[in-house]
Amino acid sequence: IAILMHAPAYNYRTDELNDYARKILRRTKGYKVDFITGHRHLNSTADIAPEIIEHSVAQVGGNLWFAPMCPDGTPHSVLTIEERNGEWSWRYRLLGESAEKQIMIVEDSADEVVIRIVGWDKKWSVEWAENGKDMGAMERTDMVDPDYRYYVENEANYNDSVMGHLRRKLISFPHYYRLKRTTENSEITITATDRFGRKYTIKSEKR
C-alpha cells in the first residue's frame, strides 16, 4: 500500500511514529506500506519497521523557493519510484541530469575529499580507491551542507524574516562521507552502492 500525505509519518527528533501514522498502520496491519510524505523540505528514507518505509521527499524548488537547494543540500530533483511485480525501487533524479548522478563532491582539497549522496539512506555503502589502490570504506560524517551554508552566508539577500528561516536550517545531516588522501593531489575514485545494489562512481582527478 502506498500512502501519500503532506505530514511526515515519522518524528525524526524523537525517533517515533507520529500518532496519526500509528492509526493508519493499525488499519493497514499485515500489508507492506510505503509512506510518501513532504513538509520537512528534506530528503530522507526511514525504515520504520520491517515492510514499513517512509520516503520524505525534498522540495523540488529548494528551501521554500528562497534557496536553490534544500538545507540538506538536495538540489532541484525529484524522487522516482519504479514498480515491478509488486516490488519497488527508487532513487532521486537531479533535474537535467542522468539518473546515474547520485554522488556530488562538495569539498576537494589536496589532502581531503568530502561527498554528498543525494538519495542516501542507512543501507548505502561507499568505498574509495587512491591511484587505483582499493582503500576500503569511506568515513560517514554528519555536517552542515557546504553548498547551503555558502548560499546563506554569501548569496542570499532577503528580508530579516526569510534570512532567519534560512539560517535556522543550518544544521547537520548524515549523508556525507569523507576521506584523507595518503598522497597529496592523488587520483581518487569513489564508488557508492545503494540498497538495490546499483553502483555509482565519481572521480577526483589529480591536480
What is the meaning of each model-derived region?
Residues 42, 61, 142:
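Residue-level detector of flexible, active-site-proximal loop/helix-junction positions
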Residues 52-131, 165-166, 172-205:
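Binuclear metal-dependent phosphoesterase catalytic core
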Residues 131-146:
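Short, surface-exposed loop motifs enriched in S/T, G, D/E and P with embedded aromatic residues
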Residues 141, 204-207:
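Beta-sandwich/jellyroll recognition modules and their flexible linkers
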Residues 145-180:
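Aromatic sugar-binding surface patches on proteins
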